[in-house]
Amino acid sequence: MDSTACLKSLLLSISQYKAVKSEANATQLLRHLEVVSGQKLTRLFTSHQILPSECLSCLVELLEDPNISASLILSIISLLSQLAIDNETRDCLQNIYNLNSVLSGVVCRSSACHNDSVFLQCIQLLQRLTYNAKFFHSGAHIDDLITFLIGHVQSSEDELTMPCLGLLANLCRHNLSVQTQIKTLSNVKSFYRTLISFLAHSSLTVVVFALSILSSLTLNEEVGEKLFHARNIHQTFQLIFNILINGDGTLTRKYSVDLLMDLLKNPKIADYLTRYEHFSSCLSQVLGLLNAKDPDSSSKVLELLLAFCAVTQLRHVLSQMMFEQSPSGNILGSRPKSLEPTAALLRWLSQPLDGAENCSVLALELFKEIFEDVIDTGNCSSTDHFVTLLLPTILDQLQFKEQNLDETLVRNKCERMVKAIEVLLTLCGDDSLKMHVVKILTTLKCTTLIEQQFTYGKIDLGFGTKVADSELCKLAADVILKTLTLMNKLKQLVPGMEVSFYKILQDPRLITPLAFALTSDNREQVQSGLGILLEASPLPDFPAFVLGESIAANNVYRQQETEHLPRKMTFQPLNHGFSTSAKCLTPPPSKDNAPALNIEDLIEKLQAGVMVKDQISDIRISDIMDVYEMKLSTLASKESRLQDLLEAKALALAQADRLIAQYRCQRTQAETEARTLAGMLREVERKNEELSVLLKSQQLESERAQNDIEHLFQHSKKLESVAAEHEILTKSYMELVQRNEATEKKNTDLQTTCESLNKHIETMKKLNEALKQQNEKTIAQLIEKEEQRKEVQSQLADRECKLSNLHKIAKSQEEKLNVLQKEKEDKQETIDILRKELSRTEQIRKELSIKASSLEMHKAQLEGRLEEKESLLKLQQEELNKHSHMIAMIHSLSGGKISPETVNLSI
């Protein structure tokens, strides 16, 4: 069974199931879905024909039905997942059929029914649809979906946690409305804590999902500043590179690359990465991932390397690592490990058209960035050997070796050509690298390339051609202009290049791409077109008038397209891959809907013209015939396109009828809901009146309570004043207590002083008694000496012997007298001190006057005694003087050796 028959059978079975939802019809529909899924009709669904579009519309409508079985939902989702692998079909499902909102409703219904299999398949399909795509938050069920996903992530972990995290990461990325909704939730802090706890998960996929959500929600907030602070950012870099290099698969690697690219858009984090000490080793491991055979994984790695090139310092590190100096004589197969990335890039660059088209384009962009850095740093000599290997591969990309390619493959080929020519233009920025290009690029290759673009790009002579209608025509024009720019730079170095360059500039077919460039919204294309126009305008055969007409026609077409934009049935395409799909379903301007001439009339005129032309021997007749044949084929293609658009209009009309019926049903439901709401409003008004009465009573009670509060407030003021007075009295009482304590302390000090004085007085008494005893002894000795002096005359011999002893005794007595004199002086000083202390004590303590008076009396007695002692001492001094005279007289009588003046017996 061919593909068209399969789709017709599927459409018929869907109609039967919608009419009668029986088990037999459901089984038949499941069987047809399995047949379509088994035939892998992805290319057919991307062709934008009526039958596949109707099938997709019916399948989406079935998903909206809440009464279909789970097995049928799973089968439909399986088919849609298979179709969503193609980027163009994925965008169509999102933007035209609004599959995101439909699947969100299915998720909410399946979660309520606890159907995990349907829930898992829907989440996985939503994750595939929303990955790296614009997401409209205004769709139905989207808010419920986000709330449900957050709640499920915060619940206990199961097999659905990982896809829920992945879908949340897609929804939050570059979507401010979703981020705002999540940030306004009441449990957002607990959600952040849950995500942070997932950073320690054993699965690297869960870790990168959680980190991606955190970066989308908190990167420019306080939580993000703490999470991505300079203290933590190096650990975050290490974690991301670890996930990127050792990830669980292509999915994990994709999300880790997207996360790192989003972080690099922050200038502060990009600066942190330039100072990351392990960046070189991590970059080396990332370059090693290019050796993998998975094109999806390699394309994400190439995107990451291009993101590194957006930061000048990182691009410099990358170029140094790509072109490290290798030992001389090495060929590509025997190069050291440091040059393996260049070999991997060459391998991805030379992939076939039906292979990894993204990898080839990204590899060429990476070469352009690297060579720009090499030229800026002046390190072109290190790339000479690699450039000789790269240029043949690039020139292979500039040739159409395959024949009978479809439009998609031709478009991919043109994209590669554009990037390859940009690499050659970059190499021409340095003289030494330009010479490598001159050696391998010939004039024939450039002219052949331009002629091929005139052919494959369907660029004719007519001005006003709708270049914006055809993506292929855009790419062909870009290839032609960039090739001419390259020829302009090399025209003085390549033989024959200058002649061919100016010849092509005078070709009328150049008008269409030149007009497209001058009316483009791309700055580089406008600059390139102006450069070519500057070279072509002085030429004599340059069709300047035709160029002006073409530019005017393009401007008119753009204006009409802008005016018809609100009437278009489809959404605007969101990325490059979906542009042609939207344009195929979009009607052209009104002036092209009705061609001026019918095709049969043109054929008759052409045949008549041929009969006449057979008789005319003009050389230009064949050229005119080619022009008319090209016009004829163009009109035929336009007629077929109008027929397709008519069928699309009919289909759109049927869909509009269905939408009108749905609107009528929704209107009746809305009226019913309005009546219900009116009844509810009346009930609310009645309750409001009851509440108003209750409110008045509450107000009276509140007024009474307010009066009571005022009385209590006045009473509290009085209590506060009493409390203040009490506090003042308490302070004064404490001050008096402190003064009393100080006085008591002084009293105790004075008592101790008095006791010490009493002790001193007792010691003085003892000393006086001792002095009395000594005086008595001295008197006895003097008496004895007086008796001895009476016996001197009879005992002169004995006296001479005893004279020495007496002399010694006199000396000892003299010493004792000195000691007594000193003690007397000490006593005098002590008496002075005591006088001072007594006077001070008398002033301080008047209450102790009785004791002070007794002390004064005692003092007077002591002074009397001291005076008596002094008188006694004077008497003793006089007696000693008498004794000294007597001793002197004795000596004078004995020998006359000692004069009375020399004898001193004074104390």
From Swiss-Prot:
Q: What does this protein do?
A: Acts as an inhibitor of protein phosphatase PP2A. Promotes anchorage-independent cell growth and tumor formation by preventing dephosphorylation of MYC, thereby stabilizing MYC in human malignancies. Together with TOPBP1, plays an essential role in the response to genome instability generated by the presence of acentric chromosome fragments derived from shattered chromosomes within micronuclei.
Region ranges (Required for interaction with PPP2R5C): 161-247
Q: Name one Pfam family in it.
A: CIP2A_N
Q: Where is this region: Required for homodimerization?
A: 389-559
Q: How does it assemble?
A: Homodimer. Interacts with MYC. Interacts with PPP2R5C; this interaction stabilizes CIP2A. Interacts with PPP2R1A; this interaction stabilizes CIP2A. Interacts with TOPBP1; forming the CIP2A-TOPBP1 complex.
Species of provenance: Mus musculus (Mouse)
Its main subcellular localisation, reduced to a broad class, is cytoplasm
Recorded phenotype for the gene knockout or disruption? Mice develop normally and do not display any abnormality with the exception of a mild spermatogenesis defect.
What family is this?
Answer: Belongs to the CIP2A family.
Print the organism lineage: Eukaryota, Metazoa, Chordata, Craniata, Vertebrata
Residues modified as Phosphoserine are S906
Name of the protein in question: Protein CIP2A
Q: InterPro entries from the entry? A: ARM-like, ARM-type_fold, CIP2A, CIP2A_N
Q: Which GO terms describe its cellular component?
A: chromosome; cytoplasm
| Biological process terms in GO annotation | chromosome organization; DNA damage response; neural precursor cell proliferation; neuroblast proliferation; positive regulation of neuroblast proliferation; spermatogenesis
Residues bearing N-acetylmethionine are M1
Q: State the compartments where it is located.
A: Cytoplasm; Chromosome
